[in-house]
Every structure is written in structure tokens, then in C-alpha cells.
Amino acid sequence: PLLAKQISGIPEYTGRLINALATAHPEVDWQLFYSGWRQRPDNWLNLKEKPNISWHPLKCPNKLINGAAWLFDRPRLDKYCPADVWLLPHFNFTPLTGRIPTVLTIHDLSFLRQPEFFSWRRRFWHASLHLPRLINKVDRIVAISENTKRDLMELLAVPKEKITVIYSAANPDFQPIAPSDPRLV
């Protein structure tokens, strides 16, 4: 989904976050890892080409990487793309050595809170990701709302000290509409 031509949800969050961080901190070298067979589109995730962003593709089918991660906890992605800190914009199969501080963003836990709204296939997928194991491995968790933080504490027993709430910013295209604007009718 991150290499999809139509960008929404987590890919949009990721692109906007990296764009903002790379702009705010030009002294930091931002290394972006992605995998799969697809070619990265020219303006992937709406990231402008910045001299402090470098790309680290792993040309391998994601299903193969996911299978190896699930069965063998390999490949250790932080060995492939070393960094001072790993930022995971969403939980997925992410085999890491545990030697690099890691921050994980959790957008919601609806699949745990209301599993009846998910197909058996989606429930299996979420269960296979072993989210509790990943949460134990990471150093910090960003929750995008107080509700997500509460769900993390209630459903997965995550200590509140490990969670920071950072709300997602509004899309810059969003602008207030004047009361006289005919679109309000």
C-alpha cells in the first residue's frame, strides 16, 4: 500500500511527517526504507526531493519478506538500513535487532476493539503481525489520539509512560470556508 499510486491514510501520514521533519531538520539525514518489486513513483508519498533524504529499496516481494519475518524474524531491517532511530509509521512485520531506538505509530486498534467488523482474513492478518511482541520491542509509541492511547493501555497493557499522543495534522489543502460561500448551502 505504501507504493500505491493513490495516496491515502498511512502513506499520506508518512509522507507528510517525513516532509515536515526533513524540512524542520535539514541537518538530519533521513533514510527511507521500502521493499517490494514496484518502482518508486517520482514524487512518492508527496515527498519533495530533498538533499537530506536518501532511499533504501529492498527489491524483494513483500510476501517473501513478510514470510521470512514471521517464520525466522529475518531479515533484520535495521542492519540493512542502519540509523540512529527507527520510525515505524505503522505496525507490520518488522524484524529488528533491538539495538536501535525505535518509535512506532499506532493509528487505531479497531481490529482488537471491534473484531466483528473485520473479515476472517483481516483478523488473521492482524493476529499474524504479533503486535504485542512488536510493542514490547519498541522504545516509544506515538498514538494519534487519546482514544488510541487508552486502547493501548486497556487492550495491550502498554504502560502510559511509553505512549505519547501526537495528533495528526490537518491536510494543508484544508481551509475554512467563509460563511457566505455557496458551497455551504
Kindly label every feature range from the protein language model.
Residues 1-185:
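Carbohydrate transferase catalytic cores enriched for Leloir-type hexosyltransferases
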